[in-house]
Amino acid sequence: MSSFEGYHPLLTPNFRFDWLTQFRLKQVSQLTHQDLAETAEWVNATMRHTMARTALTWGIERRATHKLVGWGGFERLNLQQKTGRTYLTGPKLPANEQQEIVNRLVHFAQEELGLDDLELEASTNLDTAVLAAAGLLQRGDVWHWQRH
């Protein structure tokens, strides 16, 4: 795909992944703990990276409540080398919800982006059992997946 435009919204049984511009700025601001001006600047910067195909960031909304629960996606994307780093930011969610989101991110990296090498930095908001169940292996502070 020549642009990332078709990569939104993404749906899982319980979550909707969409561009941060599709959410109310106040909701995003509450999660980032920044004022509205700083948040707007940050959202614009993330969208510039998305349009440049160097990153891909979605707001993640709980579908049942329409509540923004965090954001995640990919950074350090190099589509020619088929490498990138995935992340999930926001408050810690229950393990089953973490699993649904992480599985979607890993599958997206493999199937849609065609990555051969994916990293995820260890985080206190993600359970290690969730990461292992998604097929990631821990190497120090970084979790890693590699196509064989």
Residue ranges and their predicted role:
Residues N96-L105:
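Conserved acetyl-CoA pyrophosphate-binding loop and the N-cap/start of the following alpha-helix
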Residues M1-P94, H107-H148:
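GNAT-family acyltransferases
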